[in-house]
From Swiss-Prot:
The gene is psbZ. The chain crosses the membrane at residues 8-28, 41-61. May control the interaction of photosystem II (PSII) cores with the light-harvesting antenna, regulates electron flow through the 2 photosystem reaction centers. PSII is a light-driven water plastoquinone oxidoreductase, using light energy to abstract electrons from H(2)O, generating a proton gradient subsequently used for ATP formation. Coiled coil: none annotated. This is Photosystem II reaction center protein Z. It is found in: Plastid, Chloroplast thylakoid membrane. It is a multi-pass membrane protein. PSII is composed of 1 copy each of membrane proteins PsbA, PsbB, PsbC, PsbD, PsbE, PsbF, PsbH, PsbI, PsbJ, PsbK, PsbL, PsbM, PsbT, PsbY, PsbZ, Psb30/Ycf12, at least 3 peripheral proteins of the oxygen-evolving complex and a large number of cofactors. It forms dimeric complexes. The keyword Plastid applies. Its main location: plastid. It comes from Welwitschia mirabilis.
């Protein structure tokens, strides 16, 4: 169970870094938001799911 928690935590950190870098680039690029908003929304949705997954898995680890 610990390895699942660690992999989920790693995925959360990786998606967080991608969003930190990707969202400002999307907003700064010309016509970036209208052509890439589905990707941004998918990334944010995945991030929210991972936050809840880490919270649930943490209750099994502790």
């Amino acid at each position: 169970m610990t390895i699942v928690f660690q992999l989920t935590m790693f995925a959360l950190i990786a998606i967080s870094f991608l969003l930190i870098i990707g969202v400002p680039i999307t907003f700064a690029s010309p016509d970036g938001w209208s052509s890439n908003k589905n990707i941004v929304f998918s990334g944010v949705s995945l991030w929210i799911v991972l936050v809840f997954a880490v919270g649930i898995l943490n209750s099994f680890i502790s």
